[in-house]
């Protein structure tokens, strides 16, 4: 049985990723994708689980020594979660690219090479290239979405937020990971779900996985 491509919902903080994941979950609970393959498994809360388990806080993200350790643990946890879904297809809230992008932003390129040279990144990158990557866009248009929940790291300002989005997309481009940007102008929940599904179905039907 040929499984459909995995879906990764990624990008900067406060861009609607978790809301989109929840809406995709509701969609697949109500609509079976096909009799040929099962509904997706969902990978969620990886970073938050690492923060809690290893007693990190959001402020540690900007402390280089702590941040590199944190992002390495998140990368390991993401790889482990994906391995557990090896016989299924999944939708992931974030990806292995997210911790590396944060390391590039707050630790630096030289130290981040330790993550890029890891077996986990090689494994995850290969899987991501076969999947569907949706980057939720950070932009001035979405400024009202910025909300501090007390757990996530907040950007200094809109420019910092948008700069991280640009860094993220540039990183994906550099590593040959195809992706599509979901703009905030598509704001309705149903429209955002349809955007993801349209791209996912197109990739599955084209056999480009």
Name each model-derived stretch.
Residues 26-77:
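Conserved substrate/cofactor phosphate-moiety recognition/catalytic segment
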Residues 17:
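Conserved lysine of the Walker
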Residues 69-128:
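Glycine-rich phosphate-binding loop used to anchor ATP phosphates in small-molecule kinases
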Residues 1-4:
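Phosphate-binding P-loop
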Residues 9:
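Hydrophobic anchor at the beta1->P-loop junction of P-loop NTPases
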Residues 107-173, 180-187:
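A glycine- and Lys/Arg-enriched "phosphate-lid" helix/loop adjacent to the NTP-binding pocket
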Residues 13:
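The conserved Walker
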Residues 20:
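Hydrophobic positions on the alpha1 helix immediately C-terminal to the Walker A/P-loop
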